[in-house]
Amino acid sequence: MSTDVELCGLVARLNQRLDSHIRRVADRLGITASQAIALRELGEPMRLTALAEHMSCETSNAGYVVDRMEDQGLVERLPDPGDRRAKLLSLTEAGLRCRGNVLQALSEQAPVEALSAEERDSLVALLRRATT
């Protein structure tokens, strides 16, 4: 088996394990996996289109997730100072607390916890290069 084929298989398996981990964390916190991903990505205010890109989904799907989060008091839409027509998504105090819980839970029993901190840093650097 070629290295490229093996790499594709390993990355796919890791992705499946990460998806399962996110679903377990979300279930434990009483939110959906999509909400957990959105909370992870909303470290700073951003437009819906940027969030959708970070979540690797269509803007309409991200909008549905944000609508639910807004109803739950986790996110609010604020005017974008750079464009009066646009809105920025910003976490509320409750959203910030929930994001902290998500980030903490994601770091516990993560599929990559067997790797040392240095190995995880190397993996992150390699994946960034491969995905940009």
What are these regions (language model features)?
Residues 67-125:
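Charged, amphipathic alpha-helical coiled-coil/dimerization segments
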Residues 20-59, 132:
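N-terminal helix-turn-helix DNA-binding core of bacterial DNA-binding proteins
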Residues 48-49, 60, 67, 87:
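Residues within helix-turn-helix
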Residues 9, 37-40, 63-65:
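Base-recognition residues in the alpha-helical recognition helix of bacterial helix-turn-helix
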